[in-house]
Amino acid sequence: VKKSLLGSILALAMAPLFAQVTVEDPWVRGTVPKQQATGAFMMLTAETDARLVAAESPVAGVVEIHEMAMENDVMKMREIPALDLPAGQTMELKPGGYHVMLMQLKEQMVGGTVVPITLIFEDSAGERFTQEIEARVTALGAAREGADKPMQHQHGHRH
């Protein structure tokens, strides 16, 4: 009994920590026909220090992590290599701030439809893990659907 218990304890101690990130309220801004880009927004909370390092979606040829920042009194959007997610703090990706940019869109983003997005995170040890989410498209000019509803929780998977 002692050997199997010790073996179990060692196996647990040696297992890599799973950097859990909770994704809440993911949504994508709707587009007009032939529009080539839009943003995806959500709230991210990591249990341990992590970083959002990339994202992918079948609806876009290019997906980048962006920030809005003031440069010479002008608000500019630019790509960033990663978004730090300090443990226990909620990072809001929102219009006018950090967001996931979907570019070279393959189709119009129509209100009420769902966009699959794969978020790629890295934990503090450099281990990458992914999380599949479904973000609902909010039509242009529409009030955000679900803004007053309970938040949806989605969890990631290590690869």
Summary of predicted features, one role per range:
Residues 1-9:
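Bacterial N-terminal signal peptides that target proteins for export
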Residues 20-159:
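Compact, glycine-rich, soluble single-domain proteins
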